[in-house]
Amino acid sequence: MFYKIAQKVMFQMDPEKAHNLAIGSLKSTANSPLNCFYAQKLQAAPVEFMGLTFPNPVGLAAGMDKDGECIDAFHAMGFGHVEVGTVTPRPQPGNDQPRLFRLKPAKAIINRMGFNNKGVDNLVANLKAAKSGAMVGVNIGKNKDTPVEQGKEDYLICMEKVYPYAAYIAVNISSPNTPGLRSLQYGDLLDDLLGSLKAKQKDLAERHGKYVPIALKIAPDLEPDEIEKIAESLIRNEFDGAIATNTTLTRDGVSGLVNSNEAGGLSGKPLNSLSTKVIKQLADCLKGQVPIIGVGGINSAADALDKLDAGATMVQIYSGFIYRGPELIKEIVDAYRVKSK
């Protein structure tokens, strides 16, 4: 009920201003009696993924809490994990505003944020300050002004800094809003990146005395042969997990709507079937050797279960969470519990 009222107010505002207001409000009320407006206790529905045990299969996708400012608040809502980021080595402002657009009739969002964040050192401070014991994944990327050929170094810098504080690390090479980034999904550039990250992981595991799994986040705009090559590279480099998918550059299901011609990645309900299709293709190629988090367009428990049936082990929500609120978390967890009996 409270979320519906808050949503009505925020949907009258500019989307980015509403986002910043929400983050500020959650940050100031976390771990206080005021979190009663959004906190909910969910029944346990544990899931094993990448060698870790998560309290339930529903996570918050990267992009909502880029700087890790509201980890405890999102944990209180019942998320089984919170993926923060995308974070880059140095702070950067992202693309010019406006850069975030609602397509309300389609329950969709277009964004061209461009990895706006306060930098990895700021994120690490927030990870250290979190009190809830939430399972936190850290989504890492490269700075816009780092040439793609040197992008690997940005990922290694971020990985080294967040490693001691992350439950897992997600490698984002699939945002459409950083020029050239998606080229890292192909051929030698991909193999070189994954191999370097695995070598770094081995070094950091020995140094810190703990193994932090790493997962690759891929785009939905891939041909079947491209998905197959990514799967082969994941297996060859012994990656721990995959996250499918990021936002799409297609505009299926939104043509003619206000804001549908804006540049950027489309998320929300229109992405659902495409991302589920990619999950199925990826799962078929991986043959159980690398587990998958399914994300993209989940707006109901049925959408989430479809992704699990397609081959995902866990799911993440973002746009659906904006449109539905914390009730969507509970709805999916309850459906998962019934399915798992």
Swiss-Prot record:
GO terms for cellular component: cytoplasm; plasma membrane. It holds the Pfam family DHO_dh. It catalyses: (S)-dihydroorotate + a quinone = orotate + a quinol. Pathway: Pyrimidine metabolism; UMP biosynthesis via de novo pathway; orotate from (S)-dihydroorotate (quinone route): step 1/1. InterPro entries: Aldolase_TIM (IPR013785), DHO_dehydrogenase (IPR050074), Dihydroorotate_DH_1_2 (IPR012135), Dihydroorotate_DH_2 (IPR005719), Dihydroorotate_DH_cat (IPR005720), Dihydroorotate_DH_CS (IPR001295). The active site is at S175 (nucleophile). It is found in: Cell membrane. Its cofactor is FMN. It is a peripheral membrane protein. Catalyzes the conversion of dihydroorotate to orotate with quinone as electron acceptor. Belongs to the dihydroorotate dehydrogenase family. Type 2 subfamily. Monomer. This is Dihydroorotate dehydrogenase (quinone). It comes from Shewanella loihica (strain ATCC BAA-1088 / PV-4).
